[in-house]
Amino acid sequence: MASGGNQSSPPPPAAAASSEEEEEDGDTADRAQPAGSPSHQIQQRFEELCSRLNMDEAARAEAWSSYRSMSESYTLEGNDLHWLACALYVACRKSVPTVSKGTAEGNYVSLTRILRCSEQSLIEFFNKMKKWEDMANLPPHFRERTERLERNFTVSAVIFKKYEPIFQDIFKYPQEEQPRQQRGRKQRRQPCTTSEIFHFCWVLFIYAKGNFPMISDDLVNSYHLLLCALDLVYGNALQCSNRKELVNPNFKGVSEDGHPRDSHPSSDPPCVIEKLCSLHDGLVLEAKGIKQHFWKPYIRKLFEKKLLRGKEENLTGFLEPGNFAESFKAVNKAYEEYVLATGSLDERIFLGEDAEEEVGTFSRCVSAASGTESAERTQMRDILQQHLDKSKTLRVCNPLTGVRYVQENSPCVTPVSTATHSLNRLHTMLAGLRNAPSEKLEQILRSCSRDPTRAIADRLREMYEIYSQHFQPDENVSNCAKEMANKHFRFAEMLYYKVLESVIEQEQKRLGDMDLSGVLEQDAFHKSLLACCLEVVAFSYKPPGNFPFIAEIFDVPHYHFYKVIEVFIRAEDGLCREVVKHLNQIEEQILDHLAWKTKSPLWDRIRDNENRVPTCEEVTPPHNLERTDEIYIAGSPLTPRRVGEVRTDAGGLGRSVTSPTTLYDRYSSPTVSTTRRRLFESDSPSEGSTAGRIPPQPLVNAVPVQNVSGETVSVTPVPGQTLVTMATATVTANNGQTVTIPVQGIANENGGITFFPVQVNVGGQAQAVTGSIQPLSAQALAGSLSSQQVTGTTLQVPGPVAIQQISPGGQQQNQGQPLTSSSIRPRKTSSLSLFFRKVYYLAGVRLRDLCTKLDISDELRKKIWTCFEFSIVQCPELMMDRHLDQLLMCAIYVMAKVTKEDKSFQNIMRCYRTQPQARSQVYRSVLIKGKRRNSGSCENRSHQNSPTELNTDRASRDSSPVMRSNSTLPVPQPSSAPPTPTRLTGANSDIEEEERGDLIQFYNNIYRKQIQTFAMKYSQANSQMDTPPLSPYPFVRTGSPRRVQLSQSHPIYISPHKNEAMLSPREKIFYYFSNSPSKRLREINSMIRTGETPTKKRGILLDDGSESPAKRICPENHSALLRRLQDVANDRGSH
């Protein structure tokens, strides 16, 4: 692969990644060409390659110039002829002038010929081409074309694997036929053979698929198109005179007379679509729709153009001896012209004897007459499967957040069966529905104070116009694309109204009779919901869907789109497993990078929140946090874990935290006017108000005690500020005396607390503690107060906090009782808090996985997490236009470095690539400098034009030592070749200021300069007292968060077992596998069958200790009796 040349150790991430990826690609046997000018031998091989391809001079010169440029900047590992093939393909796909003074795309040089002459397989080409696109900085439209080309190849490879067994099911084995004798030109033409039909049917299918661009990379529709081709060829084969030599007599779709079972003979060819669907994972309704609207009109056009010869009225006769040779030849020629004109892959290579070498997969059909597979064929089939798994083109990987409760697909499940199952589930969900609101939904909408029915209908109409405009047919393509778009949108409308009704019903159950007009009038909610429905429909037809295309055409910000995903999953129980995985994957993409784009509304929400990012502890329920350093007791008095920090989190949050979040919470914004200078709301939490919290940055402003004088300095609070009174505080004076004093403070404009001088009794005299008020730096706020920050005295805050509000009239209003963990709850229900709760959980899961693979201890993992949280809270601009994984990997490296447990970037990225969401672009193309809008920075919360500009004042104030130069990776020198393109100067560089580089450049130039001061607090050289406490780490969920419906016909669900105290045992029956008696299972079956609930006496829960509804158990005898009942239950269950 490509790697920077002349880099000192350790190597840059691109080089490290390349070498390891090449080992996966199997290129280790090839020699590597060092960076520099290409040798004469390479140029000679290139000239020979161009001569064999009959390449024109312009493409030849451009390809060689591109290769020279790449070889001077990168070390091209592997066969140099393979890299030359990539350069030639790019040059061949450029627009060239024509004789008619127009332009044509490509020079009609086949990609298949390029690969054959360069002795490169398709899988190798796709792997090399992705790296060449990164090095050459090719424009997005070219990358999209390559991705579509690879997707078409993957779809065809998967379908070809299905084509073989289906063909062998309805036709005889091609190996069983006798070899044909040589005949003269004037001899009578012989009937076609099964081998010829095998080739003809496949070529006819791929030619038809190529002429339907909207379904060429659509797995479900392409598969049904194949079934249509087999159905047509099979029907024609039954009318041949030698049909007994062609058709498999064991095929279950026909009777002995050659016609489908349960049908009457007719002149039209028989239709076996329904039988093929039932035998081979097809959907009858979809297949018949493809046959009627796509296949038959297209085949009729082929008859009109004389590409197929026979009876046009019933589409038969092309397999007759007089027509087959001409038809086969004409279709082959037409397909060759299509491949040369479009630069597409020649998918006939699947039929060749050298398919193993050309595709890197397998050869056609079975390699031996016995029907067994050879070892080479099995090996090549495994290679294809590895490529499919690695490319993730047709399958949805389990998100890392779900690997604990979602298993990978079974080996026997194919991509086709998975896709058809998803589509079948969609049809089941929409059965009997129409693309209009139901009577119940209409009634619900009319009951709102402002009926949104008309607004909803108008919005859907506008979105349909926008959606259909993106599927306008080309001149050479039929109107099928728009018909397909109409069909998808109609399904999405049905799903939209169905989910909307479920969402409103759930909201009414949670909120009671509250008017929902406010939520139902939100344009972002409805657009996001319909876009989500369209994504589900698109995914069901063509995995992995069209995200983010659908959200972008409707101009739905990703920050708003993510909010509806969980709402959608909770409201629709009929979603199949793959769809849920896909939606979870989309949510992860939004959380880790899409929501952090420059123009994202997220930055507006942060600005509305007074430019403050909440910490993990503030947005995460306490029972979802790791607290190994303390005993966490609900309702206990507030005990600050960090010196100099006033905490307002609660111990027991009740059920409201774990309950599903309402739409009001998801689409709410941080309240500015009522909470800007208040610690808590005036309303009690029980009344549904949003409780306030002390802002995370800065928390406390300290008053350094310089001397102890006899003067008393009075402080007059400003009206509108919040007066904070500490019940007790301990002050140690210079003479060693320790006294207890009252301490007061005022909430400052930054949201923190400024303590002012108070009267102190030292040695029997009333004296005042005075001094200048100086705010602490962000680093000091995260840690303890050092001797440089508080001199002469030590201030400790062990007691509860009382909050007083100063009214404009100068009076202090008591805002409640002293602050305790049982009476105060952080604000956790705003849309911004919900977003960061998910971000922290996602980051915690990924970091835990990386630390496990890197063999990092739990102690270091928590330090890494604290560093990562610091970067998010104090320096959120580091995430702008960047990726969450980039900050995680940098945090791992820097904390491992300062704690003397070095982990190289190469090793970190090697483990990162094993995660399902990993992409090479994450560490190869990181934003270094770009045009940034003003929004905030680490210290003054205002973004710099470049994140490399540091706040020198903050750096000079901090007393922490500077990180040693040998603790960082070397910065690439100008003379050395960068591992990835640094400045976008290619065709896609619309922003001249934007500069990108690899992860190490980002670390050295930006990340280290903003994090090093904080990170060095955890170094071994730093004193233990100056080490900030560690941030709490989020727990990893161990169970599935949603229930699963077993059958669409019966309301039977499987869900994680909940706490017994939150359920009503008298209305439910529980069966515990390998624990409950068999009688309990019979009662459940009886209740499902009859609909009657068993009597209370028979509903005693013997297994979990629940009390009998008929008779109470004495508390003192409860445990002994429970043990005896449990023993009886176990004995009965074992029989």
Swiss-Prot record:
Gene3D superfamilies: 1.10.472.140, Cyclin-like
Region ranges (Pocket): 414-1021
Biased composition (Polar residues): 656-674, 935-950, 958-969
Pfam families per the UniProt record, alphabetical: DUF3452, RB_A, RB_B
Glycosylation sites: 417
Similarity remark: Belongs to the retinoblastoma protein (RB) family.
UniProt name for this protein: Retinoblastoma-like protein 2
Species in which this protein is naturally found: Rattus norvegicus (Rat)
